Amino acid sequence: MAGKGGLRILLTGASGLVGQGVALACQRSPQVGHLAALVRRPGSLSGAGRELVVADFLHVQGRSDEQAGFDACFYCAGAPPVGTAEAEYRRVTRDITLAVARAWATANPEGGFLYVSGAGADPQSRLMPLRIKGETEVALQALPMRSVMLRPGGVRPVSGTGTRHGLLKPLYWGGAPLMKLAGAVAPSLMTSNLALGQALIALAGEEHPPGTVECADINRIASGARDPAS
């Protein structure tokens, strides 16, 4: 829950497609009083906010004191499921996420850890990305902290944000009209990175948020939280 100065948010993955939209939502939201980003390199956070530079997130535990005093961690970092080998995908998606989460649980046992997972995440899935995300969800839920798993389907970039991955840029550029249409007619399959940020902020402000939030509910929560003037 927010203090008098608004929510204090720690963000990971600020330079990625999801994180860019989430950062923008935080910077625009009157509910957010302070935004900091856990980054590997300076300059990863665009716009207002403070950066906490940690070169290797696997060793963030030694600096857990820097994570103290936040209301929620929005964990948006990850590897693209396309073109990433399984060992690397597991290292980034599970191992690094859990390293940050353990440090977070030490520094903020009452704070919320909101993890951007994916639709269909299941530790028993035959699809490698969904299986590893499912394993990560189970491990996060076992830690001594409040956690929320958000499971977006497709995520489209809006408001000038985009992917850094060269292989995916043509897909997002060419598929933008179809993705926008899908978001309108099939909210259970598609959301935007800005809507994801709006939903994260709304959930962080709840005293008892749900443990798992599917794509349609992400859009519903974002719609209810959105400023009509924005």
Which role does the model predict for each range below?
Residues A2-S29:
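N-terminal Rossmann NAD(P)H-binding glycine-rich loop of SDR-like oxidoreductase domains
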Residues P123-A225:
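Oxidoreductase cofactor-interface core, primarily capturing Rossmann-like NAD(P)-dependent enzymes
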Residues A79, A87, D95-E137, A142, ...:
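Conserved Rossmann-fold NAD(P)-dependent oxidoreductase catalytic core, especially the SDR/UDP-sugar
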Residues I9, R50-A99, A103-T106:
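NAD(P)H-binding glycine-rich loop region in Rossmannoid oxidoreductase-like domains
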Residues T12, L38, C76, F113-A119, ...:
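SDR active-site strand-loop-helix element
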Residues A37-S44:
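Short, polar loop motifs at secondary-structure junctions
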